[in-house]
């Protein structure tokens, strides 16, 4: 069963998100020397800044130097490009941390960027090579269309949801620019110890209704709930959850 937290105030959401992440960190570090986590782009990055950097009650508990950070998806653009998830995470989080408390971060290899399918497949294959078999925590967003990572709904994009061999794949037709991306596929999410979605705002109302009331598993986010619900948590605000009727998840 999926775990869902619904919050009336952003500060409460980000604080509880931070508590959740730090708990997962501590659980991992009790058993081994590092915490393997992946992040996505978009509004999730701002939530992570507020949870783990700006929240003083939590920031001192984050053992950044023991974090190994990967990216659940990335746009195939230079890392300094405004569309880069790594670049956004660097500006919002990494640049705010002291030089003595930096995590190990694994961005896409931008030196491989070309202009053809061979280059893009090579970028995905190279990233798959460095992503651990088991991540301790995968932090995810949810688009208004129900996409997560760069796994989009619709038959055009079904090849990514059906992928069982490649753990990182080239998404060559994103409906949102830039069209070329690399993305985790479902096998990575299957092997991860915990999955966590963050969704906020009125633009998410209709898709939250489809995910939680209609349980439309044609949507990648709803499919994740269906397949991996026992280890999946959602942090949402009341605005996003305004049309959801169900009380059982």
Curated annotation (Swiss-Prot):
Belongs to the glucosamine/galactosamine-6-phosphate isomerase family. 6-phosphogluconolactonase subfamily. GO terms for cellular component: cytoplasm; cytosol; nucleus. PANTHER family: 6-PHOSPHOGLUCONOLACTONASE (PTHR11054), 6-PHOSPHOGLUCONOLACTONASE 3-RELATED (PTHR11054:SF24). Gene3D superfamilies: 3.40.50.1360. Pathway: Carbohydrate degradation; pentose phosphate pathway; D-ribulose 5-phosphate from D-glucose 6-phosphate (oxidative stage): step 2/3. It is found in: Cytoplasm; Nucleus. One of its GO terms (biological process) is pentose-phosphate shunt, oxidative branch. It catalyses: 6-phospho-D-glucono-1,5-lactone + H2O = 6-phospho-D-gluconate + H(+). This is 6-phosphogluconolactonase 3. Its main location: cytoplasm. Keywords: Cytoplasm, Hydrolase, Nucleus. GO terms for molecular function: 6-phosphogluconolactonase activity. Hydrolysis of 6-phosphogluconolactone to 6-phosphogluconate. Its EC number is 3.1.1.31. Present with 3420 molecules/cell in log phase SD medium. It holds the Pfam family Glucosamine_iso.
